[in-house]
């Protein structure tokens, strides 16, 4: 799982308290968080995780599909805000489902804002849309790792997108 430990625990609490039928996560990466959330849904006894990523590497897909929790996971490869991808996501959401969304893919402001607009309408009352890595906005350039993407500096990161969306 490539997330801050406190964020993982907070997400776990939200999932446990809201018991969503569907969790959509954009940004699969290695699949750790998708499988973590699937295991929580297994404990709850219901639900499925829809993982969306522009590039699901073959070895990561195999690892996820061979995992014991794969029965609670559907993977969609494609741009998270592309019409075709969004159509596939919608097809996997049964009618009257409680839907939670976690946005954790491309962290540039424009992309996160596009995801907020595209996926926000799928979140059902009583559930949440989580925008990951908003803490990036609080890292000063001089304190950031030298190999950090320039697109993540203040003003072009998830928190700026979230603030514009709200």
Q: What residues fall within each predicted segment?
A:
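S-adenosylmethionine/decaboxylated-SAM
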Residues: 2-166
């Amino acid at each position: 799982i490539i997330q801050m430990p406190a964020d993982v625990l907070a997400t776990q609490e939200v999932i446990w308290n809201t018991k969503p039928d569907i969790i959509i996560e954009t940004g699969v990466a290695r699949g750790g968080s998708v499988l973590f959330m699937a295991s929580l849904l297994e404990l709850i006894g219901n639900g499925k995780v829809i993982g969306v990523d522009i590039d699901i590497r073959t070895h990561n897909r195999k690892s996820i599909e061979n995992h014991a929790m794969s029965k609670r996971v559907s993977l969609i490869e494609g741009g998270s805000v592309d019409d075709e991808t969004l159509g596939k996501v919608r097809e996997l959401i049964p009618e009257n489902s409680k839907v939670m969304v976690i946005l954790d893919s491309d962290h540039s402001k424009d992309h996160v804002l596009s995801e907020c607009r595209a996926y926000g309408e799928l979140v059902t009352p009583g559930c949440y849309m989580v925008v990951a890595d908003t803490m990036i906005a609080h890292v000063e350039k001089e304190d950031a790792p030298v190999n950090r993407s320039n697109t993540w500096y203040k003003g072009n990161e998830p928190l700026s997108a979230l603030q514009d969306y709200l």
